[in-house]
Amino acid sequence: MVSAQIVGDTTLPAGFTHPHASEQARAIAEAGMILRVQVGSGVHGTSINGQDDRDEMGICLEPPEYVTGLARVPRGIDGSGDEIDFEQFQRHTVWDKPGGLDNRLGAGDLDVVVYSARKWCRLALAGNPTVLLAIFVPDEEVVYRNACGVELVDNAHRFVSALAAQRFIGYLRSQKAAMTGEVGAHTNRPELVTVHGYDTKFAMHALRLGLQGVELLTTGRITLPVPEPQRTYLRQVRRGDVRLDEVVAEVEAAEARLVSLRDDSGLPERPDRRWVDEWLHRSHLAYWNQ
């Protein structure tokens, strides 16, 4: 089935002093946008009682001087004169409040990142769990998608390979370490540890990564939002309704399943890099000639 174009909003928040939030980076992201979707707890179906910010991810094509030349963008809007390669535009609206970049995201805040298509493809080809979600988001959570974005989404399978197994395992282990307070782990939600004895949000994400990783490695796709009954269980974990020992057991079981699938998933050993290269080439040429 061919996905539909969705003519929605490409407007992004104004630039800021963050290195990836210059006005030039924002202009590139807006003008070249091919896909913009909701990600995070909202699309997973694991948000609770309006506690979450809204996470969005986008993908954009770049002007020719940034691809075939050496053009760069300013490092934020602080006028330092430093320049960096354009790879993404990143903006949190919570930065606009007193406290700026040190503020913690909360309910009603927007967290948006728009990757260059080239960077997004590099990450997706490596099996990065976070960026892969963008091509599995259901239409009702798509903010914007043009013809180029349609072609990308309809070829999601080109990016899926056994390489994703190790990435999901790594992400899961990182979240598990944070939820249990292992050496080197850090939580920015001490109130959850105080009330529940562990960081319930890290725990929920660890288990979610396990469930979604297993689905990807066995079916080649990720269902969003998380199907029932797993979705309800994830919400229970996030609320702290599940004992730590039970959560750890569930996460470790999912981790063991991922490890077993790492060498026996049935997926291609490598993604279709050739198709991706051709898609990037023709998509940029079409954008530059329009």
Where are these regions (language model features)?
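Short, amphipathic C-terminal "tail helix"
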Residues: R273-Q290
